[in-house]
Curated annotation (Swiss-Prot):
The lineage of its organism: Eukaryota, Metazoa, Chordata, Craniata, Vertebrata. Deubiquitinating enzyme involved in protein homeostasis maintenance, transcription, cytoskeleton regulation, myogenesis and degradation of misfolded chaperone substrates. Binds long polyubiquitin chains and trims them, while it has weak or no activity against chains of 4 or less ubiquitins. Involved in degradation of misfolded chaperone substrates via its interaction with STUB1/CHIP: recruited to monoubiquitinated STUB1/CHIP, and restricts the length of ubiquitin chain attached to STUB1/CHIP substrates and preventing further chain extension. It comes from Gallus gallus. One of its GO terms (molecular function) is cysteine-type deubiquitinase activity. This is Ataxin-3. Residues 227-246, 247-266, 337-356 form the UIM domain.
Length: 363
């Protein structure tokens, strides 16, 4: 591969690189190609002058720039064709009806020149193998015989113009060497600037914005996430779930706390005013309005009713120490806990029940 002559792209001098890679040597320079282009411009001017130098067509032609070259280094197919005539070489359009009628297998040709949007490059056979000598590549690219036809068909489909080079090419060292040996290429050569761009991307740390853009735009049409992106998305989903669970648990704890506080305050407030304002002989239903306390007291009274009937109900129940409304009024509850308040309410309810049973027994 080292013996193959390969010029790399400089500016827009692809026509020069195409010719030199085809001929396998530094045969043409920009100055020589510019001279050929100027000769073509002069020949065209002389043909236009035959119609009269005062004609509108001639004046318009003089005002237009050259179609054979420009300041960037581009050269037309006419310049390349005239340059090859010096070496007895001729260009034939590959997909022209005249060439297609010949029915020649591309493998049996010697070289091709390809053009697309003002870029020229050579595909040539050296020894017994084909090589893509595109000046945009870092080096020659090996093309197998079976792939050559597909390669040319792909270029045509992409809009390339392909020309077959007819004639005997100058002898070169690479052609002689590759007649004796065959080369193998493990890795395709990279484009010029591709390796530099990759190494620069590896050296520069990615910012958070670049990483975010990379995650939110996955995927170049494949719809697949790589491993890092999948892990990131999974961690993000788990984080959101944990936050939602924590919020729900916090809301639940606050709701339970408020419910317990409201229930205790309601039980105490419903029992305290009614027992304090009503006489001791009011009924159990009138003394407490809280449904929960009523159910609790009713269950308790049913369990104790038989025991109370067996005891002497004529005893002076008022002599027993009880907690009545006056006791609660004496202690406004500034130092009482919620449990003390609940116990006081239960004792008051029990006192009311006992008074009621005593009244019924006397009747």
């Amino acid at each position: 591969m080292e013996s193959i002559f390969h010029e790399r792209q400089e500016g827009s001098l692809c026509a020069q690189h195409c010719l030199n890679n085809l001929l396998q040597g530094e045969y043409f320079s920009p100055v020589e190609l510019s001279s050929i282009a100027q000769q073509l411009d002069e020949e065209e001017r002389m043909r236009m002058a035959e119609g009269g130098v005062s004609s509108e067509e001639y004046r318009t032609f003089l005002q237009q720039p050259s179609v054979n070259m420009d300041d960037s280094g581009f050269f037309s197919i006419q310049v390349i064709s005239n340059a090859l005539k010096v070496w007895g070489l001729e260009l034939i359009l590959f997909n022209s009806p005249e060439y297609q009628r010949l029915g020649i297998d591309p493998i049996n040709e010697k070289s091709f020149i390809c053009n697309y949007k003002e870029h020229w490059f050579t595909v040539r056979k050296l020894g017994k193998q084909w090589f893509n000598l595109n000046s945009l590549l870092m080096g020659p690219e090996l093309i197998s015989d079976t792939y050559l036809a597909l390669f040319l068909a792909q270029l045509q489909q992409e809009g390339y113009s392909i020309f077959v080079v007819k004639g005997d090419l100058p002898d070169c060292e690479a052609d002689q060497l590759l007649q004796m040996i065959r080369v193998q290429q493990v890795q395709r050569p990279k484009l010029i600037g591709e390796e530099t761009a990759q190494s620069r991307d590896q050296r520069l740390p990615r910012s958070d914005v670049d990483q975010a853009i990379e995650v939110s735009h996955p995927f170049d049409g494949t719809g697949m996430l790589d491993e890092d992106e999948e892990n990131f998305q999974r961690a993000l989903a788990l984080s959101r779930q944990e936050i939602d669970m924590e919020d729900e648990e916090a809301d639940l704890r606050r709701a339970i706390q408020l419910s317990m506080q409201g229930s205790r305050q309601s039980e105490f407030s419903n029992s305290l005013p009614q027992n304090a304002s009503q006489p001791p002989h009011t009924s159990q239903t009138d003394s407490l309005s809280s449904e929960d306390l009523r159910r609790r007291r009713q269950a308790y009274f049913e369990k104790q009713q038989q025991q109370l009937q067996q005891q002497d109900l004529t005893l002076n129940l008022h002599d027993k120490p009880t907690i009545n409304s006056s006791t609660l009024e004496a202690d406004p509850g500034g130092d009482m806990s919620e449990e003390d308040m609940l116990q006081a309410a239960m004792n008051m309810s029990l006192e009311s029940a006992r008074n009621h049973l005593s009244t019924e027994e006397k009747k």
